[in-house]
Design a protein with these regions (language model features):
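C-terminal non-catalytic regions of proteins with extracellular/luminal or membrane-system context
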Residues: 3, 7-205
Length: 205
C-alpha cells in the first residue's frame, strides 16, 4: 500500500462509480446541508470495498469515513440492519436497528443510504464463505432486511441518496433522489464516494 498504489486505487474507484439517477440533489450543497445521516450495513464495511479476488491493503477508507473526512458539518451514523439477517446480534430482537436509522434520518438534512451486497452473499457456487446464496442469484432483489430499511428511511421524507455496492446488478425497488452503483471500489472507495457526493469530481463509470 505505497503512496503510488493508493493513488491508483483511488483513481480506479473514482472512474468506476456509476451515477444512475440524480434529481438535482448532487452535488451536495454544503451551504444548505449541515447534517448528513450515513445509514446502512455497508457504511462501515470493508468487505463491501474488497469484493472477490482482492489483495489486502494496510488501510481501508469506508463510505462513512470518506464522508466524515470530507464533510465539515455533522455526520450521524446508524447501521440500520444486518446485511441479510433479520437481526445484527443473535440475542437481539428482529429488526432492532431500524428505529435508530429512522431517528438519524429524521434529524438529518440528507441521507446517504449504503446498501448492497458483498462477497459473503454473492459469489461462485461452492464458495465456503457464502452462507446466503452461493452461485447464480435467483433474482435481483436486495436481502429483505435491507428492503425494509430502505422503505422505513424513505418514509421519513428526507432526501435520500442510495449508494449500492455490489459486483452485479441490483434492483433497489425504490425512487431515491439519487442512486449510485459503486461496485466493490477498493481501499479508497470511501474517499472516491465523498468526492462524487460533494462535486469534487464527476462520476464517470
Amino acid at each position: 500500500s505505497c503512496k503510488e498504489n493508493k493513488k491508483i486505487s483511488l483513481e480506479c474507484a473514482e472512474r468506476s462509480m456509476v451515477l444512475l439517477k440524480n434529481n438535482g440533489i448532487l452535488p451536495l450543497d454544503e451551504s444548505r446541508i449541515k447534517t448528513i445521516a450515513v445509514i446502512g450495513p455497508n457504511s462501515t464495511s470493508t468487505a463491501a470495498l474488497e469484493g472477490n479476488y482482492n489483495g489486502t491493503a494496510d488501510r481501508y477508507v469506508t463510505f462513512l469515513e470518506g464522508i466524515q473526512n470530507r464533510f465539515s458539518g455533522r455526520v450521524l451514523y446508524a447501521e440500520g440492519c444486518h446485511l441479510y439477517k433479520d437481526r445484527v446480534s443473535g440475542l437481539a430482537k428482529a429488526g432492532d436497528r431500524y428505529a435508530e436509522a429512522v431517528i438519524a434520518a429524521e434529524n438529518a438534512d440528507a441521507v446517504v443510504l449504503c446498501v448492497g451486497l458483498d462477497a459473503t452473499i454473492e459469489g461462485e457456487e461452492g464458495d465456503t464463505g457464502n452462507e446466503f446464496s452461493s452461485g447464480d442469484k435467483k433474482d435481483l432483489r436486495l436481502p429483505e432486511s435491507q428492503r425494509i430499511l430502505i422503505k422505513k428511511v424513505m418514509e421519513t421524507g428526507k432526501p435520500v441518496i442510495i449508494v449500492c455496492a455490489a459486483g452485479s446488478s441490483v434492483n433497489t425497488e425504490c425512487e431515491p433522489d439519487a442512486l449510485l452503483h459503486v461496485w466493490y471500489p477498493g481501499s479508497e472507495g470511501g474517499t472516491a464516494l465523498a468526492e462524487i457526493l460533494f462535486g469534487d469530481i464527476s462520476p464517470s463509470g
